[in-house]
Amino acid sequence: MKTYYEKDANVELLKGKTVAVIGYGSQGHAQAQNLRDSGVEVVVGVRPGKSFEVAKTDGFEVMSVSEAVRTAQVVQMLLPDEQQAHVYKAGVEENLREGQMLLFSHGFNIHFGQINPPSYVDVAMVAPKSPGHLVRRVFQEGNGVPALVAVHQDATGTALHVALAYAKGVGCTRAGVIETTFQEETETDLFGEQTVLCGGVTALVKAGFETLTEGGYRPEIAYFECLHELKLIVDLMYEGGLTNMRHSISDTAEFGDYVTGSRIVTDETKKEMKRVLTEIQQGEFAKKWILENQAGRPTYNAMKKAEQNHQLEKVGAELREMMSWIDAPKELVKK
């Protein structure tokens, strides 16, 4: 595994160039501000609206996507996956010039062929492994978050060097930048989200909550045991792995972990995980998600509404009112 650090990257490669950050959401605002603080010339390309005004207030030169691409030598696409192909076709593609670099922080659209850049531009990825607010905060503290770097197309012969310069400008080489491929990043990212981080965890939490409430236990107690305390466990794992978590919990809990975990996540569960991975590798999930967006998201919206109306969510909202230390969002926004 090749990992790059500060000594391996030269942010001076970006000096005299302009970086266009397309999109000004979680990653967009963080990467743009970190680059600017590293002495890089940055413009923001977004359509008129809330993000346009926020970027302007933050002191950036804000312009249309088309103008930003024409202005820049490096173009970083930081829009949601489902928006990128449309924006690329509408404002990026016709304005690309020989020798430019097209950057991504997730490989979905390149790997699954939704964006097909011309052969005369570099195509690379710099993917910080943290949400935008943490990318920014840790940078301001003088540190950085780890990231992945990949080169899909090296038209100039300098794609990796420029990508590493970008990673250094964002602060990621302070922690370490691991070399990967668009395929590996995309497929593992989707797999992790679907089977563990999002799909797996939410299904497990709901199943535990429902088992307790169906067994006659109060929903408030079920919420505490199956959702609320999950943060305590995940934080311990995040800080020091499974061993640290098991060292920190009671011996009773640890023994229960050993003798019960494999009864819940069974060999059949792992077989299903492998089937999910195959679907991702063969592009079945990508096709399903692309078609879902083209159809106006009927399944997505119906499932989202059903999940929001689950008893777990209603009980949780009431209990969180008791927790003064939680800064509950007044408005739900994508991070």
UniProtKB/Swiss-Prot annotation:
Give start and end of each KARI N-terminal Rossmann domain.
1-180
> SUPFAM superfamilies this protein is in?
6-phosphogluconate dehydrogenase C-terminal domain-like, NAD(P)-binding Rossmann-fold domains
Here the disulfide bonds are none
Q: Which residues form the active site?
A: 106
Q: Which UniProt keywords apply?
A: Amino-acid biosynthesis, Branched-chain amino acid biosynthesis, Magnesium, Metal-binding, NADP, Oxidoreductase
MF annotations from Gene Ontology: ketol-acid reductoisomerase activity; magnesium ion binding; NADP binding
Associated pathway: Amino-acid biosynthesis; L-isoleucine biosynthesis; L-isoleucine from 2-oxobutanoate: step 2/4; Amino-acid biosynthesis; L-valine biosynthesis; L-valine from pyruvate: step 2/4
The coiled-coil regions, if any, are none
Stated EC number for the protein is 1.1.1.86
Task: Note how many cofactor molecules are bound and how.
Answer: Binds 2 magnesium ions per subunit.
Q: Name one GO biological process term.
A: isoleucine biosynthetic process
- Gene3D superfamilies named in the record: 6.10.240.10, NAD(P)-binding Rossmann-like Domain (3.40.50.720)
Residues involved in NADP(+) binding: 24-27, 47, 51, 81-84, 132
* Obligatory cofactor(s): Mg(2+)
Give residues annotated as binding substrate: 250
List cellular component terms (GO): cytosol
Q: Which residues bind Mg(2+) 1?
A: 189, 193
Q: Which residues are in the KARI C-terminal knotted domain? A: 181-326
- List, alphabetically, the InterPro entries matched: 6-PGluconate_DH-like_C_sf, KARI, KARI_C, KARI_N, KARI_prok, NAD(P)-bd_dom_sf
- Record: residues binding Mg(2+) 2: 189, 225, 229
Question: What is this protein's function?
Answer: Involved in the biosynthesis of branched-chain amino acids (BCAA). Catalyzes an alkyl-migration followed by a ketol-acid reduction of (S)-2-acetolactate (S2AL) to yield (R)-2,3-dihydroxy-isovalerate. In the isomerase reaction, S2AL is rearranged via a Mg-dependent methyl migration to produce 3-hydroxy-3-methyl-2-ketobutyrate (HMKB). In the reductase reaction, this 2-ketoacid undergoes a metal-dependent reduction by NADPH to yield (R)-2,3-dihydroxy-isovalerate.
Matches recorded under HAMAP family: IlvC
Regarding protein family, the annotation reads: Belongs to the ketol-acid reductoisomerase family.
- Recorded protein name is Ketol-acid reductoisomerase (NADP(+)) 2
From what organism does this protein derive? Bacillus cereus (strain ATCC 10987 / NRS 248)
**What gene is this protein translated from?**
ilvC2
